[in-house]
């Protein structure tokens, strides 16, 4: 099975969960996927941003190139086969907004991805925080989240499903960063056509 020619975008910020991100870097590469780490630049260059990202568990600097999702045009967005919101504190940092009457830029980006049914959306563990400002994205959909976020998911109108990985159409959710291997496997299976759940 191969994901050659498929682009996968992973949102990234400080306090990422190192084992999860390292796993994705290697596992998706094994399937020949083109991996892109996407973030809000906060007015900085890619090199400055990447150098400033530290992991959650071991405080290890991020080792990768970071691209901006801000201002991404529709054609570029549609070129992605999947967009993943990882575990750790990534989503909490990305959901910051200077204007509390507007959606955070990262949530706006997630809304745009949800509007494109051709894009597989993956949200794992605390990644669900990024959808909290736009609960309509998951309302009425089956999801799994970290145990600490079950109340949040239910308050967003999602249908909590007690499984390690849950698929609801073009949405794949995972319980914790520790389940990243099962989560990635499901995404690979769907994108490669092995799993027809989407």
Question: In which residue ranges do the predicted regions lie?
Answer:
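A short beta-strand/loop micro-motif in the catalytic core of glycosyltransferases
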Residues: 121-122, 143
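Glycine/proline-rich loop-helix segments at beta-alpha junctions forming the active-site rim
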Residues: 146-148
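Extended, subdomain-level signal for the structured scaffold at the beginning of enzyme domains
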Residues: 1-118, 129-139, 150-198
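Short, thiol/selenol-centered motifs that function as redox-active sites or metal-ligating centers
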Residues: 123-127
């Amino acid at each position: 099975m191969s994901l050659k020619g498929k682009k996968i975008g992973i949102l990234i910020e400080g306090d990422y969960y190192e084992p999860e991100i390292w796993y994705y870097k290697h596992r998706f590469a094994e399937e020949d996927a083109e991996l892109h780490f996407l973030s809000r630049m906060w007015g900085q260059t890619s090199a400055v941003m990447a150098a400033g990202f530290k992991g959650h568990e071991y405080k290890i600097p991020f080792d990768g190139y970071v691209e901006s999702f801000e201002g991404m045009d529709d054609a570029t967005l549609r070129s992605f086969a999947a967009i993943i919101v990882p575990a750790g504190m990534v989503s909490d940092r990305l959901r910051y907004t200077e204007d509390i009457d507007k959606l955070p830029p990262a949530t706006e980006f997630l809304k745009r991805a949800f509007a494109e049914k051709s894009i597989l959306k993956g949200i794992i563990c605390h990644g669900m925080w990024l959808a909290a400002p736009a609960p309509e994205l998951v309302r009425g959909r089956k999801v799994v989240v970290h145990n600490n976020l079950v109340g949040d998911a239910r308050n967003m109108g999602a249908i909590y499903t007690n499984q390690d990985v849950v698929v609801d159409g073009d949405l794949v959710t995972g319980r914790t960063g520790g389940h990243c291997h099962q989560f990635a496997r499901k995404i690979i299976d769907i994108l490669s056509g092995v799993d027809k759940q989407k």
